[in-house]
């Protein structure tokens, strides 16, 4: 069964294209080896790759690719060879060599859309659907990853700008961090209760000094002043 479009001509005056239509691998190879252009087109802009792919001749597709055929070539309607495919192995070959499964022709149709219109084998439809789904998932993962990278870069840039605009703040944060570390080490070395006792003794000494200097006992009202 042929999977090219309606009104397709089975005859052409271009030997290489006719060999691709006929599925003649050996003749195609001889023509390519003799110097035939692997990207030569018919009157509708189709290359040998289009014609071979439409008939499921994956061996000729591989041969054309080996001799430099453009896998991304489109006909005058914007169809790639993948748009004309109706065979699993040919689709797998083209996709594995870089053709995008979700590429659209000039009418906005993807290979899957055209395959459904032509009523191709269900295995082919399932393969195309699976490949499209993988393409969408891969795009979503890539987009999410790029957004995360951009957000991280923006955050780091903002922090760097803030530090440059506030050098004193950055220096103060460094001093505070150093003091906090020193205090923690001091408490760990001396012990919590000893530190608490030391603070209590210092507080009592402070009260005693204040009383000696002012003659007034702190926190106690209406005291007579001492005469020295």
Curated annotation (Swiss-Prot):
GO cellular component: membrane
Membrane topology classification: Single-pass membrane protein
Subcellular location: Membrane
Record keywords: ANK repeat, Membrane, Repeat, Transmembrane, Transmembrane helix
Keyword Aminoacyl-tRNA synthetase among UniProt keywords: no
Short name of one Pfam family: Ank_2
InterPro entries per record: ANKRD_45/46/60, Ankyrin_rpt, Ankyrin_rpt-contain_sf
ANK repeats: 11-40, 44-73, 77-103, 107-138
TM spans (from-to): 190-210
PROSITE patterns for the chain: ANK_REP_REGION (PS50297), ANK_REPEAT (PS50088)
Main localization (coarse): membrane
Protein name: Ankyrin repeat domain-containing protein 46
Organism annotation: Homo sapiens (Human)
Lineage: Eukaryota, Metazoa, Chordata, Craniata, Vertebrata
The gene coding this protein: ANKRD46
């Amino acid at each position: 069964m042929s999977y090219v479009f309606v009104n397709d001509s089975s005859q052409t005056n271009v030997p290489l294209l006719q060999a691709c239509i006929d599925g003649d691998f050996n003749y195609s190879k001889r023509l390519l080896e003799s110097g035939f252009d692997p990207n030569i087109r018919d009157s509708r802009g189709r290359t040998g790759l289009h014609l071979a792919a439409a008939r499921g001749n994956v061996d000729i597709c591989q041969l054309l690719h080996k001799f430099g055929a453009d896998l991304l070539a489109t006909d005058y309607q914007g169809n790639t060879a993948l748009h004309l495919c109706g065979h699993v192995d040919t689709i797998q070959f083209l996709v594995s060599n870089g053709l995008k499964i979700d590429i659209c022709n000039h009418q906005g149709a993807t290979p899957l859309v055209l395959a459904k219109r032509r009523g191709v084998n269900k295995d082919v439809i399932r393969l195309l659907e699976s490949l499209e789904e993988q393409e969408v998932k891969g795009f979503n993962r890539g987009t999410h990853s790029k957004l995360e990278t951009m957000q991280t870069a923006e955050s780091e840039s903002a922090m760097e700008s803030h530090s440059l605009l506030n050098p004193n703040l950055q220096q103060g944060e460094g001093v505070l961090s150093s003091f906090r570390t020193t205090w923690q080490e001091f408490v760990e070395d001396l012990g919590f209760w000893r530190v608490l006792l030391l603070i209590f003794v210092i507080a009592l000494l402070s009260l005693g000094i204040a009383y000696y200097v002012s003659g007034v006992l702190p926190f106690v009202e209406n005291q007579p002043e001492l005469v020295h």
